[in-house]
Amino acid sequence: MNRTYSIVWSAVRNMYVVASELARGHSKVKAQVCASEIHSLNKKSEYGQIIKATRAALACAVAAALGFFSPLAMADNQVSYADAQTHVLDASTPPMSYSGTDEGSALYVSGVATVGWQPTTVTGTGLVIETSGGGADDPDGGKYVSNAISLDHYAILELTDAKITTTGIYTQGISAADGSKLTLTDSTLTIDGNFGVMTLYTGSEATLDGTIVEAANSSSAQVQQGSTLNVLDGSTITLAQGQINVVAGNTATDEGSTLNLSDSSVSSAGTMSTIQGTNKAALNLTNATITHTNASGAAVQANNATTLDITGGNITSAGTGVYILASDARIDGATINADGDGIFITSKRKLDGYEDLNALTVSDANVTSKTVALNIDGSTTINDPIKLTNSTFTAPTAIKLGSKATIQAEKTMLTGNIVQTDASSSSLSLSQGSTLTGSVDAMFTTLSLDDTSQWNMTDPSTVGNLTNDGDITLGNASGSTGTLLTVDNTLTLQDNSQINATLDTANSAPIIKAANVTLDGTLNLSSTATFVAPETDEHFGSITLIDSQSAITTDFDSVTLDADTSAMPDYLTINAGVDANDNTNYELSTGLSWYAGANSARAAHGTFTVDAGSTFTVTSELDETTATSNWNGSKLTKQGDGTLILSNTGNDYGDTEIDGGILAAKDAASLGTGDVTIAESATLALSQGTLDNNVTGEGQIVKSGSDELIVTGDNTYSGGTTISGGTLTADHADSLGTGAVANSGVLQVGEGELENTLSGSGSLVKTGTGELTLSGDNTYSGGTTITGGTLRADHAD
């Protein structure tokens, strides 16, 4: 075999190269170099790793050419390609290694400095590449770092089933610069040093396809100066304390760098965020699994005008899930589970010169946190509405508003409280079936719900403005007293609005307070209190439901009450409406069914059913009313064996029907203006006044008290008349009906034929100028007085 050597100066590598060239098929050339230092980027990493180069000694090159190797050179197998050719390696290639304390690489590939730079391409299968070197003092400060692989000047390296290993503190896995490209397929990269998994500079690109990376200590992957890292197809990156850091240069004009992470996983236990993009970086995460097990830092962090796209996948963090600093984030179909904030947005610590991009859209995502699901930091600028679509946010605090923001939730479920910590005018809109379950403490925020959305309030809440066309349930899980919902400015309830509230009899405060109120829709009330029927309408109670600072001029379309009203008699109802005495209050009150309206628990009617042994007194004026039920709005019907007392002489209703028990009135004027019908065994009890109504039926009239009752109607009642005291005056005997008269007072009759049988200890007085004829079999014993006219008796008895 013929072997030739050449010693040449490489401007690319800044050193002399001595190569042994072995003739191979396909014009492939392998070059081995004894130099213990190879070309470096002469750059200092942001994280302190120092990568510099020194020029190899010509004597070492000559010694290598002549076959005289030092023990160190014989132990290492450094491989270098810088010839603008294509080289194919396989598993038969001896392991490549470098252990020198100066800067060096086990494998170095570089393009050639011709017009446009000619790439050198190396492909390999089953290669083993190792480094354990570095650590010597750098004259410029720091320590030299060795690399397993170094790529420079548009080099192309494609490896499959490679095993790349670094050991020792001052080692790094991969360094790529100046447009170089690296592809690792089904390979392993095991990092035991402190100085990095890889560093990509100046427009370089690395692709990990089905590759496993395990890094100890604080080793990280640095992607900077317009470079790109692709992590694809089941690749796994496990970082002990490091991160994937994607960053541009040091100024806002530098080109951004990119991370494309797809169908792969990255995890870290370090205090730094597992994945971080800074200074116009682009983070594209698709169906990725990202795990951060440290309470400090975040699983994903985007800083300074970075664009973040998360599609699918799972993000789990013991700290923050997604941290957004002056950047634009789009999250679609991902699951975020964090012990700290699920999503945190801030403008604080933004570097000068970078646009404050802060924007967020979330769709088809599930965000869960032990603290805050979506946290908007103070002093933060949000440029566009935050859009939440078909997503769930679950945390003790679902949304925290520390700065002005407009949040639009569509088909989204918010479980947790809404808390505002600043005084800016934010807004939260729920639409397209969105739900909020929690309380709201946001005095300066406008909350709105469309007709498909709902708010299940768990505790007393405060908002700036509330517009509701959906369903709101006012809850109080803590059992605190006071108002349930406070609207600092305007409450607007629209046509489809449903307000649901449970009344607490121990809490006298209004359930809603607002500065201005517009009512519409439906109010649904429920109560577990037991109803106790009062004995008079003077004991009716009321509860203020809504307390406004201005007049309430509108009303609900309907009000429902779910309560045990089995003990509530038919003549009583529960009414909801504006307080007649204070139009700034909307109240729930007990009232007469006579005046029931559209927002009463039962329809209006005129029936008073008073059970035996019970008495109910109506002091209110009963007038004709416009009823919406089958009742005519003017007829009073007394039912039951108890007693109904009418005490208002201003009553102006129509007919009276007494079907049972007693209807009593001190003054006959309380009976209204229509006819009176008294059923058999029923009683009309009067004390005074003029009964000018026509009285019919089989029941009786009882005159009580010491005053005078005047009866003037053409009466046909047949149940009899009882005078227990005072005077009963009838201008005509026909006014006394057809039944017997039991008189313990005075009966005065003017004229007519008194066919009734008179009994009792009372007296009979004939008044007026007319003629009165007595035809009954009378037994009264109080005597007879004729003050005028003629008194005739058919029989002396």
What residues fall within each predicted segment?
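All-beta strand scaffolds that present successive hydrophobic residues in beta-strands
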Residues: Y81, H87-P94, Y98, V115-W117, ...
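Extracellular repeat-rich scaffold modules on cell surfaces
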Residues: I376-P385, A395, L401-S403, M413-Q454, ...
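Extracellular beta-helix/beta-solenoid repeat scaffolds
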Residues: P95-E158, I164-T166, G173-S175, L182, ...
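Extracellular beta-strand/beta-solenoid scaffold signature
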Residues: D76-S80, S99-T114, S132-D152, T167-A177, ...
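Outer-membrane translocation/initiation segment of Type V secreted surface proteins
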Residues: Y5-S20, H39-L41, D504-A509, A529-N632
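Extracellular beta-strand/loop-rich repeat segments of large surface/secreted proteins
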Residues: T415, Q420-T421, S425-S542, A612, ...
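Boundary/junction segments of secreted and surface-exposed precursor proteins
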Residues: A75-Q85, A598-A603
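Gram-negative bacterial Sec-dependent N-terminal signal peptides
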Residues: V8-M74
